[in-house]
A protein has these predicted regions:
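Loop-to-transmembrane alpha-helix entry segments
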Residues: 43, 63-70, 100-103, 119-139, ...
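Helix-loop interface residues and adjacent transmembrane-helix termini in multi-pass membrane transporters
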Residues: 33, 93, 119-121, 178
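Specific transmembrane alpha-helical segments of multi-pass solute transporters/efflux pumps
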Residues: 18-19, 23-24, 52-103, 113, ...
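Structural signature of hydrophobic alpha-helical transmembrane segments
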Residues: 32-49, 88-106, 151-163, 227-238
Length: 240
C-alpha cells in the first residue's frame, strides 16, 4: 500500500475524529439496550458483506490469495472479534467518553509492538510524542479517575480492546496485500465476525426489540455506519 500525501492523511484523521466522537455515546446506548453481542453482531453482519459488495462494484481487487487468508484471519480476530467485543462489553460498564479516551491509547501500544515486531526504532522524537500523548490523556481523565477506579473491569476491557486494535494496525502494516483497502476491511469483518455471530447465538437471548428506543436505534445505525466507514479509514491512516 502506498503512502498518501500528508494533507490527505490529515483530512482522514479529521474524519476519523468526527466519526469517533459521534460513535461512542451512540454505541453505549445501543450496547446497553440490545446487549453487546447483539449490537456487534448487527454491525459486522451489515458492514462485512456490504464492504465486499462495494469493492466488487468498484472493480477493486477483492479476492485474496491463499497465503493471505491466515493473515486476514489474524486481522479479523484482533481488529474485529477482539476490538468489537471488548469495546462493546466495556461500554456497558463505563461511559462513552472514558471508553473513547482509553481506546486512543492504541498508538502507545502500536508503537511498542512495532518496535518489537517490525524492529522500528523508538527514537527520542517518537518517545517524546508518546509521552506527550499519554500526558494529554491523563489531563483529560483528571477528576474522573475515581469513577474509573470503581469500574476496573470496564477499564481492563477497554485497554484490551485498544491492544487488539494496535495488533491489528501493526499486522496490517507488516504484511503486503494484493487486494484493496475496502476489500481487506470487508474480509476482516467477515472472518472476525464469525466468532461474534456464533457467540451471540449461544450466549445472548434473542433481542427484545420493544426495548429499543429511538436513541438506541440511532446508536445501531451509527455503529454500523462507523464499522463500514471507519475501518478503511483507519487502515489508510494508521497502517502506512
Amino acid at each position: 500500500m502506498a503512502t498518501g500525501p500528508p494533507t490527505l492523511a490529515l483530512v482522514l484523521i479529521g474524519a476519523i475524529s468526527v466519526l469517533w466522537g459521534l460513535n461512542w455515546p451512540a454505541m453505549r446506548v445501543a450496547s446497553v439496550e440490545l446487549g453487546p453481542w447483539t449490537f456487534r453482531a448487527i454491525c459486522v453482519a451489515i458492514a462485512g458483506p456490504g464492504l465486499l459488495v462495494i469493492a466488487a462494484h468498484r472493480k477493486e481487487p477483492w479476492w485474496p490469495r491463499r497465503m493471505a487468508w491466515p493473515r486476514i484471519a489474524l486481522l479479523g480476530l484482533s481488529g474485529v472479534t477482539g476490538w468489537q467485543l471488548l469495546s462493546a462489553m466495556a461500554l456497558t460498564r463505563i461511559g462513552g467518553g472514558a471508553a473513547a479516551i482509553i481506546g486512543y491509547t492504541m498508538p502507545l501500544w502500536a508503537a511498542l509492538i512495532s518496535a518489537l515486531w517490525l524492529r522500528e526504532r523508538l527514537d527520542l522524537r517518537r518517545a517524546g510524542a508518546l509521552l506527550l500523548g499519554a500526558s494529554g490523556m491523563l489531563v483529560l481523565f483528571r477528576g474522573g479517575l475515581a469513577g474509573l477506579a470503581e469500574a476496573p473491569l470496564g477499564v481492563a476491557l477497554m485497554l484490551g480492546a485498544a491492544l487488539c486494535w494496535a495488533v491489528n494496525t501493526v499486522a496490517t502494516k507488516a504484511f503486503s496485500w494484493d487486494i484493496g483497502v475496502i476489500a481487506l476491511s470487508g474480509w476482516q469483518l467477515v472472518l472476525g465476525g464469525i466468532p461474534i455471530l456464533l457467540a451471540w447465538r449461544i450466549l445472548e437471548p434473542d433481542p427484545d426489540l420493544s426495548r429499543l428506543t429511538a436513541a438506541g436505534l440511532a446508536g445501531v445505525s451509527i455503529g454500523a455506519q462507523w464499522t463500514v466507514d471507519g475501518l478503511p479509514l483507519v487502515i489508510l491512516v494508521f497502517a502506512h
